[in-house]
Amino acid sequence: MKYASWLTLSVTAFACAGCGGKNTESAVETSGADKTAKTQVLEAGAAVMQNREPLEALNAYIDGFHFYNGNIKGQMEAHHYCALLNEDVTQCVIYDGNTAHSKLMGVEYIVSAKLFAGLPAKEKHMWHSHVQEVRSGQLIAPGIPEFAEKEFMRKFAGTYGKTWHTWHTDQDKELPVGSPMLMMGFTKDGQADEAMIAARDKRFDTSSAENRENRADIDYPAIDPDADAWQKGIVIQLRAIDLKGTEGAETHGAPSP
């Protein structure tokens, strides 16, 4: 799809940013005191006076499902608010709901098949494909017309995502404690919890089954064999270690302790 057409869909999604939302509350209440009147006034002033261009660039809303890498039973709904950086790269912030009190669960970076093909195999092991999410009808773009959603999904089907969750509200955690977790997406029918899908479909007045039928004519690409590595028993997660005195530890360019 040409950039202009994709941009048109993005504008459509932005115009409907308030559509298909406000129907999913956060899974937890946050620990801490209620906002004082002073805090609310300061917050309101900041909202009016400060620049928020990075937030305003989040012009696409996608709702889908993730599971913990290595634990397919640990499944949850994920509300993605995304900015299309260019034709090949999209970045999303992920919430556990779509209301003002939703918790920021994590992030997902999405790249085209062209860019993904150039990544090292070990890097690819941390990424998941999107073919099944689209083909199953379980991935939706709430609030935009059906034709626009289908074109959105046609492009999305060939992409790959790298997702980290940092606040595990599905485990009833009131604070973002614990290690960040690498997440994956479903790759076959029967993997997703049917009750979870049905509950989401009811809230959004959609049907994953009907979505699947509507997307049957999408030309789904072959999946890179190094993606979805959990299917081959390659499971990657972070482990907390004390870097002090640890030789060979990867610090990503951070200053030495």
List PLM regions with ranges.
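Extracytoplasmic c-type cytochrome modules immediately beyond a signal peptide or single-pass transmembrane anchor
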Residues: 47-48, 52-112, 116-120, 125-132, ...
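Bacterial N-terminal signal peptides that target proteins for export
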Residues: 1-7
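An exposed acidic His-Trp-rich patch
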Residues: 98-182
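Generic detector of short alpha-helix boundary/capping microenvironments
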Residues: 7-8, 82
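N-terminal domain-onset segments
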Residues: 20-89, 159-257
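C-terminal motif of bacterial Sec signal peptides marking the signal peptidase cleavage site
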Residues: 15-18
